[in-house]
Amino acid sequence: MKYLVLLLVVTLTACNQPDDLALYKTNLEIAKKGISCYESPANLEVYKSLIHPDVKHQSAMYGQGIVGYEDLIGQAKFYMEGFTNVTFENQLWLPGVDTTTLATDGSVRVYGTWKGESIATGASFSVDSYHYFHIKDGQIDFSGDYFDATGMVQAVSASAETTPTETDPAETAPTETTPAETE
């Protein structure tokens, strides 16, 4: 009987191991530091120090796909030097999970809203986003951004502030044709 109880205890404890969030908590600080580099005042040098040289990053920019270190730093520079008064609001930080086992794997993900202004035009933006980070040896080695980057850039561009001009109705009116012209 005592072996049966022991077997039951071992089985239950082996099957119900609590998720270890220690790695997530360590990586969370690195991910938060990376996000904060985009907020005003931006800090590209600190951001560079957080990125692994072999990073693979899913870009939010249309047509970019997965990019490496140089392209990721180029995109970061574009945002950091092109926008001011940037904040990341309504943050919801969550542990990432292994897609096979659904156990926490130390990765980090976050939902939030970016707000700021274009330095070139002064136009403001607000865009909801999702980001994920996998961290290796204290640096981000796999990450991704999901938000409407192209729409955000178009919304704050100088051309977005101009209004369409009225066209001359004579230029767009359909022309009449006679039956003889169509034969």
How does the language model describe each region?
Residues Y3-T13:
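Sec-dependent N-terminal signal peptides
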Residues M1-Y3, E183:
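Short, Lys/Arg-enriched, disordered terminal segments
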